């Protein structure tokens, strides 16, 4: 098994490639197969951004591995005006949808409920097969309810925390 722990700077040459969809690139722990059909175990540092197309990893045995975003079924969204596209992005953002933003278009994973919403908003939705590279997010850490790392966020008590008085 090819065991991988480290992300590295871009390299001119590599020994293997991993062709992964967005969900697989978002995991820090993953068992998969390389394009060369070798068993691979990813053990990356937790809490990091998803792997990106063209990123490089180093295996324990020293080999360099290139990450490739595998094409997947996406919705390609366009609108007749910038306002309508912005409105579509706003509504998708309210649903915490992973979203790839381009010049005059949006892309998201195929979902019939979101397609119905976009249709109601007047967007043009086309189903395509393409690599998915969504925005990582403004705060980088993702949305979670874990208490891990809580000491980094020392906020004053809120009004509705029972038993807390000023």
UniProtKB/Swiss-Prot annotation:
Transmembrane stretches, start-end: none
SMART domains: UreE_N
A biological process term (GO) from this entry: urea metabolic process
Keyword Cytoplasm: yes
Entry GO MF terms: nickel cation binding; unfolded protein binding
InterPro entries in alphabetical order: UreE, UreE_C_dom, UreE_N, UreE_N_sf
Xref: CDD domains: UreE
GO cellular component, one term: cytoplasm
Keywords (A to Z) from UniProt: Chaperone, Cytoplasm, Nickel, Nickel insertion
Role of this protein: Involved in urease metallocenter assembly. Binds nickel. Probably functions as a nickel donor during metallocenter assembly.
Alphabetized HAMAP family for the sequence: UreE
Name recorded for this polypeptide: Urease accessory protein UreE 2
Protein species of origin: Pseudomonas syringae pv. syringae (strain B728a)
Gene of this entry: ureE2
């Amino acid at each position: 098994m090819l065991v991988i722990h480290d992300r590295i700077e871009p390299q001119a040459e590599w020994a293997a490639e991993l062709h992964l969809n967005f969900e697989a690139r978002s995991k820090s722990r993953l068992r998969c197969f390389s394009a060369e059909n070798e068993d691979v175990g990813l053990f990356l540092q937790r809490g990091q951004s998803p792997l990106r197309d063209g990123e490089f990893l180093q295996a324990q045995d020293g080999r360099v591995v290139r990450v490739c975003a595998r094409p997947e079924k996406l919705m390609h969204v366009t609108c007749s005006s910038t306002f309508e596209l912005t409105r579509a992005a706003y509504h998708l953002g309210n649903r915490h949808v992973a979203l790839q933003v381009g010049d005059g278009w949006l892309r998201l994973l195929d979902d019939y409920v979101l397609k119905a919403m976009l249709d109601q908003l007047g967007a043009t939705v086309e189903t395509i097969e393409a690599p998915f590279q969504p925005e990582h997010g403004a705060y980088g850490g993702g949305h979670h309810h874990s208490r891990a790392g809580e000491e980094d966020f020392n906020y004053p008590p809120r009004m509705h925390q029972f038993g807390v008085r000023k």
